[in-house]
Every structure is written in C-alpha cells, then in structure tokens.
Design a protein with these regions (language model features):
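Aromatic-acidic/polar surface patches that form glycan- and anion
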Residues: 1-2, 68, 72, 88-94
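Rossmann-like dinucleotide-binding domain that binds NAD(P)(H)
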Residues: 1-50, 93-100
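A general structural signal for well-ordered alpha-helical segments in protein cores
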Residues: 5-6, 72, 76, 102
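Generic hydrophobic alpha-helical segments
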Residues: 9, 78-82, 105
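Short secondary-structure transition/capping segments
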Residues: 12-16, 37, 63-75, 111-120, ...
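C-terminal substrate-binding/catalytic lobe of Rossmann-fold NAD(P)-dependent oxidoreductases
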Residues: 29-77
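C-terminal helix-rich "cap/oligomerization" subdomain common to oxidoreductases
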Residues: 84-139
Length: 139
C-alpha cells in the first residue's frame, strides 16, 4: 500500500516522476522513481521487521531526516483550512501523479521489477476505470 510514505516522498521531490520500478521480497519492497530532472527518489515498505516511519533526504549540502510521525495535528489543521476555504492543500495534478506512481509500482511488481513509465501506468488506469464504469452501468 504505502500511501503515506509515497506522500512523504512527493512532499520532498515534487511532481515530475517519469518512471518507476519495484523490487520485492518477503521482507518488503523498494520502489525507485526517476524524475524528469534526473533526481532519483525511493520508497521502502517493510513488511517484516521494525515498522519505522520517516526517511532521509540527500542534498548537495548533506542529508536531512524527514517524515516521522508527529501526530494528527498538522493533518487536522489542513483539513479545517480546506473546509474553511474550499482550496485543497495539494493540487489535483499531484494527487493524480501520486496514485499513478503507486499504479506503476504495482505494475512493476507484477512484471518482476520492470521499469514502468508513469504515462503507461496512467493509460492503464484510465482503461481499467472505463471497464469498471461500463460494468457498473450494466447493473
């Protein structure tokens, strides 16, 4: 699954991921994304062993600890702000790219770690959505 870890990755990296591959074992998964500007971002989901939330951002000036669980205060503040203003804290484009990143990750796992472009995953997602809509309309 990994939505929270992927959201943290996107908070650091921003949009612009082009391709993804995912390596898996019985202990967990490592997903690697390549961004348009050449940066590489990784997400690791651990299924056996310590459940640690957070990460490390590597910059030209050094490394910085990121993420970590600080409670729900910040999330609730953003939810309240959204209900007051009607303006979502994250753009539609970023939200779609995050879900496309996860779709590409799953496709890569199904294909033994093959590199999947986000465009390929996006098109597959649209195709799958149209099938679901068609099936729902038949009921």
């Amino acid at each position: 699954y990994g939505i929270h870890g992927v959201e943290t990755l996107y908070t650091i990296m921003g949009t612009g991921c082009e391709s993804v591959n995912r390596m898996s074992s019985d202990r967990g998964d490592v997903v690697t994304g390549r961004w348009k500007d050449g940066r590489i971002g990784t997400f690791r989901g651990i299924t056996k062993g310590p459940q640690i939330y957070g990460g490390t951002a590597y910059t030209p000036k050094g490394s910085v600890a990121v993420g970590g669980y600080q409670g729900y205060k910040t999330l609730l503040e953003q939810i309240l702000k959204f209900f007051r203003t009607g303006i979502p804290p994250i753009s539609k484009e970023e939200t779609i790219e995050i879900f496309t990143f996860m779709k590409a990750s799953n496709m890569s796992k199904e294909q033994n770690g093959k590199i999947i472009t986000l465009e390929e995953a996006y098109q597959k997602g649209w195709k799958d959505a149209r099938k679901l809509i068609k099936a729902c309309n038949k009921k």
